[in-house]
Amino acid sequence: MSEAQNKISGSGRIGYYVAESLEPVYREIAGLLGVSLGPNLRVALDADQEASPGRQATPSQAVPQHSAEMPNREKMPNRWLLSNVDAILVEGISLTRLKELLLNYSGQKTKPLLLVCGSVSGENSGFRLKTFSFSLGSEGSRLLMEGRDYTEKGVGEPSLDLMLEEIREVLRREVRNYLELPPIPWGYAYAMTLTHDIDILSLKEMPIARTFLGYFYRSSVLNWKRWRSGKVKTAEFYRTIWEMVRTWAAKVGLGQDVWQRALPTLLDLEKRLGVRSSLYFMPFPEKPGILPEHLREAKESAPANRAAFYDVAKYQTLLAGLEDEGWEAGVHGIDAWHDVQRARAEHSRIAVLTGRDKLGVRMHWLYFQSPDSFKALEEGGFQYDATFGFNEVVGFRAGTLQPYHPLNCQTLWELPLHIQDGALMGEEHLDLNREDAFRKAQPILDFAKRFGGAVSLLWHNQSFTAPRFWGEVYERLIAQGRKDGAWIALPRDVLHWFTCRRRCRAELSTEGTHWQISCALADREIIPADPSRSAGQSIPAAQSTRLDLADLSGPSDPLAPRIPPVRIRLQIEPKRVKSISVPYEVGQGYIDFPAQTLIRLEVEGED
């Protein structure tokens, strides 16, 4: 079979040629792009330059792992590396050495596409060259590790996703039959995670101090102001007054106070809506923790009202019941953000109560200090952090809708926070009415429809009762997500899906009009979940073996929901495709498939 008859191209045959300091961020960027990062050409070329005449150099970085014809890595010439990439990302480095090798390589019919981000030196004439105005590596590092300040212009736009989309558009246009893995679960438009910080479980447990008295201030003075401005309805205004009376009675042992009923109200709402969420509980009572350095003035200790006034150990039955009924219990951290030992203690406290070791965390009051906090949380044993967002506004602190691995971590996921109730409607922040709050948050969902990813919502349990009544906006955002076709799932399930996407390798092989797409993990074959939920069509053909993505996490949990398959996107004019062996969705200039061991296509005309 000649080379013309059997062509193979991988999902994202992308090499990179960047300054050494930018290598970690480019490895993470490859995961966000949905491609498997190929050779580090800077290292490979340095090795080639140092090799003695006639001796083959050994690249120190991994090459694409999906090619069936890949030679022995220890004997792999660097020219083979160049012939097996469709594009090379370049930033912060001279093109002179790369140009020399590319020009001298006569065996390569088509020179790789050079994607130049930011400033580079050296001549680049004669190449397939696309330049971008942004420095993807340096700006990506800043966004993923430090994040933007809420006062920065444009925090309401996912700046990193916008940069990545510019690169994707060039790859789709310039690389023939380009394969990618979009951050969009099969059968859905995007993912949505619902989360709740459980700061308070009961007012009557609290001393008559700032937080307790603050409730009465909000229920009287602010309640009146919000009623006069139309932010609460008349019935809600009077209900708030009545709840104040009931709360004073509860303080002396007569009945339940309003915030004792907040969590049951929240859970009943989610049962009615058929959704589940993650609830983050304070691990220890009466510990306010310490302040981040940028907030310290006279003392190190955080304000006393940052402490919890409930002992989570007394609620073990509640936490176990939540897990049994499909919710997720996590940690609302106190000092885990700055101290590994305290991170381990806070993790252990909730792990013992839930019987689960893989836990998420969100720091109370969003205390965080990058880059040290990421590492402390990873070494503390957490699976993911959900802190990276704003108290003051809604938007994109990390510039992306996608979960990601912080650049100084190996296992920790960061699940960025995008929409918070207090930022929208809190009197100390945007102070919007409910209609304006929904409209302010809706553009974030619109970006998710455009780019995929995972929208993260935070609603405190006390927001579902008097005097706030903010549950209406929460319910509307869930309804909008469903209308959009969002997969509303627990954070751990969403991260399971993104783990599958990172590990999935897709390969296209063509033989005349017969095409095949094969899928495997980086280290073994996979099997995704049932792809029957599809908005596209299915053309009968030879039955392919299905892949079960639950295989990634060991024995299946009988209570765990089905995880949707990874989505594979092939850039091809849909009218050329005559038959497909799996369900599919048609887009403008592309076709999407659910990940399968083998996908067969009959295509009109040889490529």
Range-by-range predicted roles:
Residues 305, 329-340:
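Glycine-rich phosphate-binding "P-loop"
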Residues 266-274, 308-329, 347-354, 405-410, ...:
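Acidic (Asp/Glu)-rich catalytic clusters
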Residues 218-220, 296-326, 353-359, 381-391:
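Acidic, His- and aromatic-enriched active-site or binding-groove loops in soluble protein domains
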Residues 195, 330, 362:
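Generic enzyme active-site microenvironment
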Residues 1-54, 66-68, 72-306, 410-537, ...:
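Terminal accessory/targeting
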Residues 289-293, 325, 340:
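Secreted, luminal/periplasmic, and some membrane-associated catalytic domains
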Residues 22, 26, 335-413, 457, ...:
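Catalytic domains of cell-wall/extracellular-matrix polysaccharide-remodeling enzymes
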